[in-house]
Amino acid sequence: MSEKLQVVTLLGSLRKGSFNGMVARTLPKIAPASMEVNALPSIADIPLYDADVQQEDGFPATVEALAEQIRQADGVVIVTPEYNYSVPGGLKNAIDWLSRLPDQPLAGKPVLIQTSSMGVIGGARCQYHLRQILVFLDAMVMNKPEFMGGVIQNKVDPQTGEVIDQGTLDHLT
């Protein structure tokens, strides 16, 4: 019997009641038996990228730890909202820090992007921008399956913090 595929989720939202957080927390429960899905630490504690700080102080411990967990994983699922037609600032900041590391954690790594929003197109514009960023970092961005969860607020249970809409669950699996 082979080892389970190790996949980590990177949440692009900092909000406590994040719908994307609910999607991310649902993934380990619906993953196939051959896959283990674990959440990466929150990106909330990563300071704003500053090349002067990097040169003087090196990389923050939060960035080093995040990078190591990504390196150890077989793949990454980025679960994120769309802010102002693009990538949330916190997620872009985390990626900016990761991109400066000499041993690139995302290079050659399979990455799947999942976006959700309260609007009907489910974060599609964010996906396009995020793909451009990740391709530059030599990540192996998966073209399919695409998940853009539109009107996500109607597909989750805010009490349990999980996706409850069967069509959405089917699409996620």
Model-predicted regions and their roles:
Residues S2-M35:
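N-terminal beta1-alpha1 ligand-phosphate binding loop
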Residues S2-V8, M140-T173:
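Glycine-rich phosphate/pyrophosphate-binding loop and the adjoining helix
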Residues G12, S42, S116:
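Cofactor-binding loop segments of dinucleotide-utilizing enzymes, especially the Rossmann-like FAD-
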Residues P32-N38, A139-M140:
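A generic structural motif
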Residues N38, L112-Q114, M142, F147:
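Hydrophobic/aromatic beta-strand patches that form the interior of the parallel beta-sheet core
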Residues S42-F59, D157:
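N-terminal beta-loop-helix "entrance" segment that forms/cooperates
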Residues G58-D138:
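Helix-loop-strand module that forms the ligand-binding subsite of alpha/beta enzymes
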